[in-house]
């Protein structure tokens, strides 16, 4: 099922092409970053205060669904602070020694960005506690009764952690972040602005209606908006005169099997499973995962945020239920 998810045009998980091309489309400073206004305003104040005191920014936790700009914000913070950034991920730091090597190579006030920080193993996480709190590493020398601990001072730094699953962070780790920001799904106006900005960078002509059409099918996610823009640009180049209008965008997105709300056949399968197998719910997450063949985390991180925002499903203490709006969109008669 992982391969199936990677093939989806509207997945919010990064594809290899996204990772290559996103760097060119990413804004470099807060003034160019579209959306997340509350988060931006807070970060602007905290960054300016840290610069005035000539101190590192307090540790930052960014959380929310994939594709909303957590990595972009981390790079922007480093740029605004005029410091270097080291980028890694929770799964990549397998041993305490791996983390120690990274920390000891940071210069004063540098940013360490750990994506998927909820996937750090516990032994690595415990090394991080004194590093975050005291800018120090506690190293154990020797074994058994003769073992002793020495403390190694580190340069002051800012840790930025990113996660799609803030609830999986341990309390000791979460409590050490001084700045915690939740990123929300984008509205169509914000996504339209992102599509138009990206089109300018890609040197692609797009009119307002064409940009709005792509934005409306992007599931509230900039990563998806930029991916759809690139595919619509391909279609416009081969099947039209290269100009992205509403008509061209509609034709391209029909070909890509992305409907007017940004839903595809996988979303339809998820909704139909809940309706036909479980009478519209409630259905437990584990049961839904087993029935659809999708992983539990994939359902929670990839499908649910947008379906919830659209009012197609609802979460209850007893499980997920399908809402009337989903029946209407997919032309399925609702149960009497």
Swiss-Prot record:
Gene3D superfamilies: 1.10.8.60, P-loop containing nucleotide triphosphate hydrolases, Winged helix-like DNA-binding domain superfamily/Winged helix DNA-binding domain. Mg(2+) binds at residue 71. InterPro entries: AAA+_ATPase, AAA_lid_4, DNA_helicase_Holl-junc_RuvB, P-loop_NTPase, RuvB-like_N, RuvB_C, WH-like_DNA-bd_sf, WH_DNA-bd_sf. The keyword DNA-binding applies. One of its GO terms (molecular function) is four-way junction helicase activity. Keywords: ATP-binding, Cytoplasm, DNA damage, DNA recombination, DNA repair, DNA-binding, Hydrolase, Nucleotide-binding. Pfam families: AAA_lid_4, RuvB_C, RuvB_N. CDD domains: AAA. GO terms for biological process: DNA recombination; DNA repair. It catalyses: ATP + H2O = ADP + phosphate + H(+). ATP binds at residues 25-26, 67, 70-72, 133-135, 176, 186, 223. It is an enzyme of class 3 (hydrolase). Residues 187-257 are annotated as: Small ATPAse domain (RuvB-S). Its EC number is 3.6.4.-. It is found in: Cytoplasm. It comes from the Bacteria. DNA binds at residues 296, 315, 320. HAMAP family: DNA_HJ_migration_RuvB. Homohexamer. Forms an RuvA(8)-RuvB(12)-Holliday junction (HJ) complex. HJ DNA is sandwiched between 2 RuvA tetramers; dsDNA enters through RuvA and exits via RuvB. An RuvB hexamer assembles on each DNA strand where it exits the tetramer. Each RuvB hexamer is contacted by two RuvA subunits (via domain III) on 2 adjacent RuvB subunits; this complex drives branch migration. In the full resolvosome a probable DNA-RuvA(4)-RuvB(12)-RuvC(2) complex forms which resolves the HJ. Has 3 domains, the large (RuvB-L) and small ATPase (RuvB-S) domains and the C-terminal head (RuvB-H) domain. The head domain binds DNA, while the ATPase domains jointly bind ATP, ADP or are empty depending on the state of the subunit in the translocation cycle. During a single DNA translocation step the structure of each domain remains the same, but their relative positions change. Belongs to the RuvB family. This is Holliday junction branch migration complex subunit RuvB. It comes from Alkaliphilus metalliredigens (strain QYMF).
């Amino acid at each position: 099922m992982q391969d199936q998810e990677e093939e989806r045009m509207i997945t919010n998980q990064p594809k290899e092409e996204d990772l290559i091309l996103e760097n060119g489309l990413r804004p470099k400073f807060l003034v160019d970053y579209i959306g997340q206004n509350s988060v931006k305003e807070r970060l602007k104040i905290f960054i300016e205060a840290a610069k005035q005191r000539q101190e590192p920014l307090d540790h930052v936790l960014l959380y929310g669904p994939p594709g909303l700009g957590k990595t972009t914000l981390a790079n922007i913070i480093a740029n605004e602070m005029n410091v270097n950034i080291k980028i890694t991920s929770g799964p990549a730091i397998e041993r305490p020694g791996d983390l120690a090597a990274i920390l000891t190579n940071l210069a004063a006030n540098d940013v360490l960005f750990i994506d998927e920080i909820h996937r750090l193993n516990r032994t690595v996480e415990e090394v991080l506690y004194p590093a975050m709190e005291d800018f120090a590493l506690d190293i154990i020398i020797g074994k058994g009764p003769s073992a002793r601990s020495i403390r190694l001072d580190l340069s002051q730094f800012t840790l930025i952690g990113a996660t799609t699953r803030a609830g999986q962070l341990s309390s000791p780790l979460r409590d050490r972040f001084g700045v915690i920001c939740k990123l929300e799904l984008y509205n169509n106006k914000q996504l339209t602005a992102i599509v138009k900005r990206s089109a300018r960078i890609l040197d692609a002509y797009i009119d307002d209606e064409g940009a709005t059409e792509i934005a409306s099918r992007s599931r509230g996610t900039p990563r998806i908006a930029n991916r759809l823009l690139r595919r619509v640009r391909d279609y416009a180049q081969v099947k039209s005169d290269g100009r992205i209008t509403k008509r061209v965008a509609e034709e391209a997105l029909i070909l890509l099997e992305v409907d007017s709300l940004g839903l595809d056949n996988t979303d339809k399968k998820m909704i139909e499973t809940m309706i036909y197998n479980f009478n519209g719910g409630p259905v437990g997450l584990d049961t839904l995962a087993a029935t659809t063949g999708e992983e539990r985390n994939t359902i929670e991180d990839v499908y649910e945020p947008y379906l919830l925002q659209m009012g197609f499903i609802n979460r209850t203490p007893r499980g997920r239920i399908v809402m009337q709006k989903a029946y209407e969109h997919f032309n399925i008669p609702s149960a009497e």
